[in-house]
């Protein structure tokens, strides 16, 4: 049985590397990404226990310097699915802080990897991590479909009497 740190170092890092991610390059993969968690702007006092920092086990970055996905890691003896909500919260808080969509989350115990496109599909078990290029392409397709949908809705609204 491995602890989470060993699982990350001995299994998850290797699986990311086999998909082409340079786990030693922080412009591609950052471990322990510090995510600020704050209250909504209209809430000024008192300071809440819900404010502070979260640390995503991994953030996978695109060429533009923004995260494409977060990865929540669990030790090998734990069910990877217990990281689902935690990973979603990380993605949601990154999105709030950056103002950019962050729909892709992964959670894994090193052996089982789950992928969740939080905007389009339910979580599903996958065999490995995608390449950086593949993930960036999927994100562009998602963004393109959203822009197309928004444009269509605006045109429909403008055409109504």
Across the structure, where does each feature detected by a protein language model lie?
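ATP-dependent helicase/translocase motor core
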Residues: 1-161
């Amino acid at each position: 049985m491995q602890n989470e740190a060993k699982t990350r170092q001995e299994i998850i890092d290797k699986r990311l590397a086999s998909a082409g991610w340079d786990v030693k390059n922080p412009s591609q993969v950052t471990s322990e990404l510090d995510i600020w968690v704050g209250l909504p702007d209209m809430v000024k006092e008192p300071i809440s226990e819900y404010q502070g920092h979260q640390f995503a086990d991994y953030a996978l970055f695109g060429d533009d310097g923004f995260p494409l996905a977060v990865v929540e890691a669990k030790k090998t003896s734990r069910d990877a699915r217990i990281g689902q909500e935690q990973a979603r919260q990380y993605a949601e808080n990154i999105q709030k802080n950056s103002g950019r969509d962050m729909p892709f989350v992964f959670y894994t115990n090193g052996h089982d990897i789950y992928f969740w496109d939080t905007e389009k599909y339910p979580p599903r078990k996958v065999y490995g991590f995608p390449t950086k290029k593949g993930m960036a392409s999927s994100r562009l397709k998602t963004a393109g479909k959203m822009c197309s949908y928004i444009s269509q809705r605006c045109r429909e609204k403008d055409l109504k009497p």
